[in-house]
Amino acid sequence: MEEEKYLPELMAEKDSLDPSFVHAMRLLDEEIVKFQDSEGNKEDGEKKYLDIISNKNIKLSERVLIPVKQYPKFNFVGKLLGPRGNSLKRLQEETGAKMSILGKGSMRDKIKEEELRKSDEAKHAHLSDELHVLLEVFAPPGEAYSRMSHALEEIKKFLVPDYNDEIRQEQLRELSYLNGSDDSERGKGTRGRGIRVPSTPSRNRGGVISPAFPGRGASATRGAPITRGTISTVARGIPTPRAKAAPTTPGYRLPPPLTIETYDDYGYDDGFGEDYDEQSYDIYENNYNSQTQSVSEYYDYEHGTNEESYNHYEQEEWSKSRSTLKAPLQRPARAGYREHPYGRY
């Protein structure tokens, strides 16, 4: 009997036997394993030495059995392939090894698989074998064995019959994403309606701005010590405006009382359009004209000022203030004193 045809005949007899023939099935399995071991020993005998100096590429191949007999209801092929075969592709890229699912049950179409098994073509001879994963590596010796070891460790994780492990959950998420039903990546933001909340409390629309420091026209507290040579930021001589009921900001009115609107009554067209359309441009012009007059008075530094209202710093005051010292300092006489602090300008 030719050795090339012996193994396929053993596999064919095993498939043709009824599972009730337990002893015949056991004997056939032992014969198949014995023949495969003898073939492996022949190959090992021919390959006696490994040349690592030349660093030539070698080919390694291993067949990993898929435990379909122990777990017949679990879909190992589907777990290995993943959605659209992406899991097996990523596994090959990660390990650097070529992986192929071969053997009985590796094809989805069972009728076509049976037809190809009965054919005598050598490329379909694997359909008579047990369901397994063929690992092939073609690389230099050191790298080849390293890739094979990595591939064996990774393929072992896919042969665990667990429906809720990390690999299975990742495949389900990928499948939902590919089908377009993954809503986790789409953010659905809700927008509050009915109440308008100002973003910053510094200035409200139509409201009054609370001044943090004295503005124009504010009166300064008299009697406070004044540093010589510095210009005060408070305007002098301009009367303080009286308090008014309406805000002083031109073009704005007090907002209506805040009301909470329902979702049905609120619309995107509602806003401040009806309140501010009634104002005309004449109101803005009158406000700006009145403002220009007050500005001109503000920059007129001599308007409403009297020389008598300010203290004159002369030599007598300096001599009186230094009377308590034992030896007053002698200050050189100055050429003259300015009558008004803004005289030079």
UniProtKB/Swiss-Prot annotation:
SMART domains xrefs: KH
Domain KH span(s) in chain numbering: 65-131
Annotated function: RNA-binding protein that plays a role in the regulation of alternative splicing.
Entry's family note: Belongs to the KHDRBS family.
UniProt biased composition (Basic and acidic residues): 336-345
Gene Ontology cellular component annotations, sorted alphabetically: nucleus
Organism: Xenopus tropicalis (Western clawed frog)
GO molecular function: RNA binding
Gene Ontology terms describing biological process: mRNA processing
Gene: khdrbs2
The protein, known as: KH domain-containing, RNA-binding, signal transduction-associated protein 2
